[in-house]
Design a protein with these regions (language model features):
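Structured catalytic core of nucleotide-sugar glycosyltransferases
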Residues: 2-151, 166-177, 187-202, 206-209, ...
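Conserved nucleotide-sugar donor-binding catalytic segment
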Residues: 161, 177-186
Length: 258
């Protein structure tokens, strides 16, 4: 990965955010690796009341550690919003989200996501990857089929639930400001697909970036028992349905043969 020559003043202020709960096995290496990016990002850990050594290891690795505002789980949406507010307060120009359980993270993941915004002039970059055949069950069985039905313009996205997402501060601010009444930002697992749908509806150019292979510890928890993903599946499903109602897309289901 090559970069154009930039003066110190022209390099954007990048911040990387890891939402995490009980990720002591990977978090220290993940933070250390992210900080090695060409863009020298500051790192924020949003902790969901971990009971292991996640917080201590994150602080040791040099991260800014904040607490998820409410003690509920799953609450990825809450964590992402808290991380964004912290990044806004610290004057970030570009904000990157990464999953905290990745075993094979490299600095180039951050580089690729940020570089897409700078060089390719897209508004949001999202990672996609080669994954184990039994991985990404919610993506394959819920997210992609439902997007194909209600938001066919998004059906080409390989990983609509990607945890590796990057956008400029103004994009994140605008997306958060779109929430209203019955369509507030999801608190849980629906947040990833919500950001994708809202970004696309807003007219932003969203681009997927190939990151190679993804190896993550959460897959080990559900590879033999996919029912452990039921709460995630439920939240993703209802988020897409709610978005379909909001944007008058329910009629699209009539095109599906049943």
């Amino acid at each position: 990965l090559t970069h154009q020559n930039n003066s110190q003043n022209s390099v954007p202020k990048v911040m990387v955010i890891f939402p995490a709960k009980n990720e002591e096995g990977t978090i220290e290496n993940s933070i250390t690796t992210a900080r090695q990016s060409y863009y020298k990002p500051d790192v924020i850990l949003v902790d969901a009341f971990s009971t292991d050594k996640t917080i201590q290891l994150a602080e040791k690795a040099g991260a800014i550690v904040i607490q998820q505002p409410i003690k509920i789980f799953p609450a990825k949406g809450l964590a992402m919003r808290a991380g964004l507010r912290e990044a806004f307060d610290r004057s970030a120009d570009i904000i990157v989200f990464l999953d905290a359980d990745i075993r094979n993270l490299t600095p180039e993941w951050v580089d690729k996501l940020v570089k897409a915004l700078i060089d390719d002039n897209c508004d949001m970059s999202r990672g996609f990857y080669t994954r184990h055949a039994r991985d990404a069950a919610v993506t394959k069985l819920i997210a992609r089929p439902m997007l194909h039905t209600f938001f066919p313009e998004l059906s080409h996205f390989e990983q609509p639930l990607s945890g590796e997402v990057c956008a400029r501060r103004q994009v994140w601010e605008n997306l958060l400001n779109r929430e209203n009444g019955s369509s507030s930002t999801p608190d849980g697992w629906g947040i990833d697909v919500w950001f994708l749908i809202e970004a696309a509806i807003s007219g932003y150019h969203v681009k997927e970036i190939f990151m190679g292979t993804k190896e993550h510890t959460s897959f080990e928890d559900y590879r033999e028992d996919v029912s452990k993903l039921s709460k995630m599946a439920e939240q993703v499903e209802f988020t897409i349905i709610r978005e379909a109602i909001k944007y008058d897309r329910l009629e699209m289901q009539k095109k599906v043969n049943v």
